[in-house]
Regions:
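Cysteine-nucleophile active-site neighborhood
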Residues: 78, 82-128
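RNA-binding accessory domains that recognize and position tRNA/RNA substrates
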Residues: 1-80, 91-93, 108
């Protein structure tokens, strides 16, 4: 995996609003989330995100906008997020970091909460 940027291959090509408001409950299967009010807006940078992570954000009544792994900070900030999520994904964080680290550095300057999982967390660590 060394030097492989696989995130670019699996990332969304277009920005989209996550609209699947169904929640998985082991006992019931998918059920509709009855609380329609969205409290926080999270922008998820897609390095290969799993849909279940997006479902969990919905469970917590977050509005979630998913953007490409190469979306620049200026365009992310135009979405007026309350926080930034750096997703999981395949590949070498150093290779993906070549374009991701400058974006994350620009986002950090705006004092927004930024958090990640797996590859996203590794890229955040490289950024800091």
């Amino acid at each position: 995996m060394k030097n492989l940027d696989l995130a670019e291959k699996v990332s969304t090509k277009k920005t989209y609003l996550w609209k699947d408001l169904k929640t998985w409950k082991k006992e019931n299967g998918f059920i509709k989330n009855k609380n329609k009010k969205k409290n926080l807006h999270v922008v998820a940078i897609d390095y290969g995100i799993k849909k279940n992570i997006l479902r969990y954000f919905s469970d917590f009544n977050c509005k979630v906008t998913v953007v490409s792994c190469k979306t620049v900070a200026k365009d992310i900030l135009k979405l007026k997020p309350n926080g930034i999520f750096l997703s999981n994904g395949p590949g070498d964080p150093a290779a993906t970091g070549k374009y991701a680290i400058p974006i994350i550095k620009d986002l950090i300057k705006n004092n927004l909460p930024i958090f990640g999982i797996c590859l996203g967390h590794q890229i955040l660590a490289l950024t800091l």
